[in-house]
Amino acid sequence: MHNTSKIKTWVLITGASSGFGEEFARQYAKQGHALVLVARRLDRLQALAATLRQQHSVEVIVEQVDLSDVAAIVRLQERLRERGIAIDILINNAGHGLQGPFADAPLDAVLSMVQLDVASLTAITHVFAQDMRKRRRGKILLVASLLAYQGVENFAVYSAAKAYVLRLGEALHRELKQDGITVTALCPGMSDTGFAKAAQMKITPELRMLMMEPAPVVRAGIRALNAHHMSVVPGLANKLMAIFIWATPRWLHQAAVSRVMKAQ
């Protein structure tokens, strides 16, 4: 159903060229929202924008931005402000991971992941939260991970980064609530988004059984954001895993999760 409000609602989606970001764009376009799609791959963004305009008759703006550059995030905000665009919903989805022993990974690759998954996510949240606070309304969804609930062998930096995202979301949920802003952390498990290939992951049979399609994950995130929830874990199997992590000693759930994540 399209958004029939006379006031145009703008949704900014980072990492919109694939995976969860692309699916968020499709679902929000179907609802009739105007979109700002942000990613590095301009050709993918333009193709997606053309499809969404044709299918849903919505306004779509494409912004090719390297989000690892904080100055580029500030310039993005300035360009939108100059066009009179105020972001009502921020989907902070951009990020990447890398599987493997911590000490074997090139240092520049590790720091690049920290920059995008932590520093850049913080920067874009800060920039647009300031604008939302002035208007006393807005919604922010931070894409974390089920791995945020514990340190994970061979995903040391990624799981630590996503733990930061989850804790940031929990804190901001309470902090910005008084300003009329909802902040929700989405904690998906293994999903068929292309992330595994980009992270050079080997998919175990256990992981393949747990893998979700992007659409239900995104629907769960949007529902939780609209319901003003602090966080959400999509999918029954992922919820059970989160409960298992919460209810068992650290040594036990770390051993179990490592078994699931390791390629055999």
Predicted regions and their residues:
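Active-site helix of classical SDR
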Residues: 125, 161
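C-terminal helical subdomain
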Residues: 185, 205-242
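Conserved NAD(P)H cofactor-binding loop of Rossmann-fold oxidoreductase domains
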Residues: 93-98
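Substrate-binding pocket helix/loop in short-chain dehydrogenase/reductase
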Residues: 101-102, 106-114
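Conserved glycine-rich cofactor-binding loop
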Residues: 15-18
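Residue(s) in the substrate-gating loop at a strand-loop-helix junction
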Residues: 145
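Conserved glycine-rich Rossmann-like NAD(P)H-binding loop of the short-chain dehydrogenase/reductase
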Residues: 31-48
